[in-house]
C-alpha cells in the first residue's frame, strides 16, 4: 500500500542527515578522483551516461539515499502513476505524459478511450498532415508550398517545443531532414508577434495555435494579431492555421482551422513536448520520422526510470542527490550548464519544468511543509556562462550545485584546428576543467585568487546531440523532477501559483481596481 508522507517524518531521512559529509576537495584529488569518475556513472538511453563522481556522495551516502528511496516508495509511486492512478490530486487527474511515447504498464482508459491509442492516433494524424504539407498536397491559396511554421502558445506550449526545435535544427540540416523553418510567438508583448511576423513571408507560413482550454488570454490575443496580419496581406486565415487543443475546447470544431489535433487534461503543459503540442511543430519542421526518433529516446529513458535499484536508475539517483543537496546540505539553487549551443533554451525549459512542478509550500493534502522543496533553476550554455556568472559559482558565498551536459561530437561537423586542437575539443576541455576546478579548487595565498572548491556537479555525457539523445535527456529531467516531488510529498503536476496574477490582470483591464493595484495601473497608462 502506498503512503504519502512528508520528508521530515521518514526515519531514512533522519539517518541520511547523520551520515558524515563528503569532502569533495579530498575525494576528487589525484587517483581517488580518477577512480570515482570511473566508478560513479550510470548508462542512460541513446548512448548517454550520467556521471556523478563530482557530487558530495560516497558509498555511505548512496546507501542512505537507497533507504530513502525505499521508504518513500519512489518506484511504487511511479508504477501507480503510469498505471493510471490519480496522482495529480489538486486537479483530480491522471498523469499520462509518459504514455505519449510508450506504455510502461497496464492499459489506461479514461474518457471512454484507451489513452495510448488516443495519443498514437493523434501522432498519426499529425504525421499524415505534415507529410502532405511537405509533399505539396496541402498548400496556400496560390497552390504554393508552405516554407515556415509558426507556433503560437505560451508556457509549456512554447518553452519545451522551442527548446527541442533549437536543439535539433542544426542536426536536421546536416542530416537532410530539415523541412521548414520554425518560429515561435509566445509573449503578449506586441513586439514579440510583430517581430516574428516581420521576419517571415506570411503567404508561405502555417501557424500552429496551441491552447488546451482554447481560452488562454495571451495565446488568443496573439492569434488575433496573426489573423490581422494575414487579412492585411489579403489571405484567408483559415487556410493558414491549425489548432492543437482539447476535444472539448471551442477551437476543436471551429472552421477557422485547416486541422485540429488533440491533447487532454492528463498532460500538463510543461510535460507536453512529446504530445501533440511538440509533435505538430517538430513534425512539420523536421518530418514525422525525426519526431518518432525523439519519442523513442524518451521511451527508452522512461524504462530505465522503472528500475528499483537506485544505482542503476539515473533519474532516481539524480533526484535523490538533489534532495540531499537541498534538504541536508542546504543548497538553494541549481545551475543547468549544457556545453552545446543547440541546447541554448534547454535551461529555460528546465526552469519551468522544475520550478512550476516543485515550487510548492504545501503537501499533497494542502498542509504547509516545514522543509525546503524545489530549488531555483537557472543556466546558460558553456562556454558562454564561464564569462558570465561562473565567477559567483566559483568564489561566491553560496554553493550552487551544477548539472553539466556535454557531447563528444558537434552536430554540424564543421570545425577548425587552432593551436593543435579543434573548437569541439576546446569545448570539451572546458567542461572537464570546470568540473575539476569546481570540485577541487586551488589554494592561493592571495585570497582574491583562492578557490575553495567543494562545489558539487554532475554531467550527462553523450556522443552527439541526436533526436534520440534529446528525447532521453528530456525524459531524464522530467522523471528526476517527478521523483523529487514524490520525496517532498508535493503535487508536481498542478500550478496554482500562476493563477492569482491572471485574475488581477483581468481586473486591471476591466478597470475594477483600487489601492496599490489602481496606482500601478495608472502609472502604466492602462
Feature-to-residue mapping (PLM):
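C-terminal structured subdomain/cap of oxidoreductase catalytic cores
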Residues: 449, 464-517
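Short glycine-rich or small-residue beta-strand-to-loop segments that form or flank ligand, phosphate
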Residues: 147-155, 207-213, 333-340, 377, ...
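Short, solvent-exposed amphipathic alpha-helical segments in soluble enzyme
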Residues: 164-169, 198-202, 224-226, 350-358, ...
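Flexible, glycine-rich loop/tail regions that form catalytic "lids" or insertion modules at the edges
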Residues: 1-73, 312, 316-325, 343-346, ...
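Acidic, Ser/Thr-rich peripheral helices and adjacent loops at domain boundaries
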Residues: 413-449
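Glycine-rich phosphate-binding loops that contact phosphosugars or nucleotide phosphates
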Residues: 128-136, 142-308, 507-510
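Active-site phosphate/pyrophosphate-binding segments
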Residues: 229-414, 453, 500-526
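Extended, charge-enriched "interface" segments that sit outside catalytic cores
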Residues: 4-142, 419-428, 439-440, 462, ...
Amino acid at each position: 500500500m502506498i503512503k504519502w508522507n512528508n520528508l521530515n517524518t521518514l526515519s531514512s531521512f533522519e539517518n541520511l542527515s547523520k551520515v558524515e559529509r563528503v569532502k569533495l576537495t579530498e575525494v576528487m584529488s589525484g587517483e581517488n578522483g580518477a577512480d570515482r569518475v570511473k566508478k560513479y556513472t550510470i548508462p542512460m538511453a541513446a548512448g548517454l551516461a550520467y556521471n556523478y563522481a563530482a557530487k558530495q556522495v560516497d558509498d555511505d551516502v548512496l546507501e542512505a539515499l537507497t533507504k530513502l528511496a525505499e521508504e518513500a516508495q519512489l518506484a511504487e509511486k511511479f508504477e501507480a502513476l503510469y498505471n493510471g492512478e490519480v496522482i495529480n490530486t489538486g486537479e483530480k487527474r491522471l498523469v499520462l505524459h509518459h504514455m505519449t511515447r510508450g506504455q510502461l504498464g497496464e492499459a489506461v482508459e479514461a474518457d471512454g478511450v484507451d489513452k495510448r491509442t488516443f495519443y498514437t492516433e493523434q501522432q498519426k494524424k499529425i504525421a499524415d498532415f505534415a507529410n502532405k504539407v511537405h509533399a505539396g498536397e496541402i498548400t496556400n491559396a496560390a497552390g504554393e508550398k508552405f516554407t515556415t511554421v509558426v507556433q503560437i502558445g505560451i508556457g509549456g506550449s512554447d518553452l519545451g517545443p522551442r527548446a527541442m526545435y533549437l536543439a535539433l535544427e542544426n542536426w536536421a540540416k546536416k542530416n537532410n531532414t530539415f523541412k521548414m523553418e520554425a518560429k515561435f510567438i509566445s509573449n503578449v508583448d506586441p513586439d514579440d508577434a510583430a517581430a516574428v511576423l516581420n521576419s517571415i513571408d506570411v503567404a508561405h507560413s502555417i501557424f500552429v495555435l496551441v491552447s488546451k482550454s482554447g481560452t488562454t488570454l495571451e495565446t488568443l490575443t496573439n492569434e488575433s494579431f496573426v489573423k490581422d496580419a494575414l487579412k492585411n496581406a489579403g489571405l484567408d486565415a483559415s487556410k493558414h492555421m491549425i489548432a492543437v487543443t482539447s476535444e472539448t475546447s471551442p477551437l476543436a470544431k471551429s472552421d477557422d482551422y485547416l486541422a485540429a489535433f488533440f491533447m487532454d487534461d492528463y498532460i500538463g503543459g510543461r510535460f507536453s513536448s512529446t504530445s501533440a503540442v511538440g509533435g505538430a511543430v517538430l513534425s512539420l519542421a523536421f518530418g514525422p520520422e525525426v519526431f518518432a526518433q525523439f519519442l523513442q529516446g524518451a521511451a527508452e529513458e522512461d524504462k530505465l526510470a522503472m528500475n528499483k535499484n537506485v544505482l542503476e536508475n539515473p533519474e532516481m539517483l539524480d533526484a535523490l542527490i538533489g534532495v540531499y543537496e537541498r534538504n541536508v546540505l542546504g543548497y538553494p539553487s541549481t545551475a543547468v550548464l549544457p556545453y552545446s549551443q543547440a541546447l541554448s533554451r534547454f535551461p529555460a525549459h528546465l526552469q519551468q519544468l522544475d520550478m512550476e512542478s516543485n515550487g510548492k509550500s504545501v503537501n499533497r493534502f494542502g498542509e504547509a511543509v516545514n522543509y525546503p522543496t524545489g530549488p531555483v533553476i537557472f543556466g546558460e550554455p558553456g562556454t558562454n556562462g564561464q564569462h558570465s556568472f561562473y565567477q559567483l559559482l566559483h568564489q561566491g558565498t553560496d554553493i550552487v550545485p551544477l548539472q553539466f551536459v556535454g557531447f563528444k561530437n558537434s552536430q554540424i561537423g564543421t570545425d577548425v584546428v587552432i593551436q593543435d586542437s579543434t573548437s569541439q575539443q576546446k569545448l570539451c576541455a572546458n567542461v572537464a576543467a570546470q568540473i575539476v576546478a569546481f570540485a577541487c579548487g586551488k589554494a592561493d595565498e592571495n585570497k582574491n585568487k583562492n578557490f575553495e572548491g567543494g562545489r558539487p556537479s554532475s554531467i550527462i555525457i553523450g556522443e552527439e546531440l541526436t533526436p534520440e539523445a534529446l528525447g532521453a535527456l528530456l525524459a531524464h529531467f522530467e522523471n528526476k523532477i517527478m521523483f523529487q516531488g514524490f520525496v517532498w510529498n508535493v503535487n508536481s503536476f498542478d500550478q496554482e501559483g500562476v493563477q492569482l496574477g491572471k485574475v488581477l490582470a483581468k481586473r486591471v483591464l476591466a478597470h475594477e481596481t483600487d489601492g496599490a493595484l489602481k496606482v500601478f495601473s495608472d502609472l502604466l497608462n492602462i
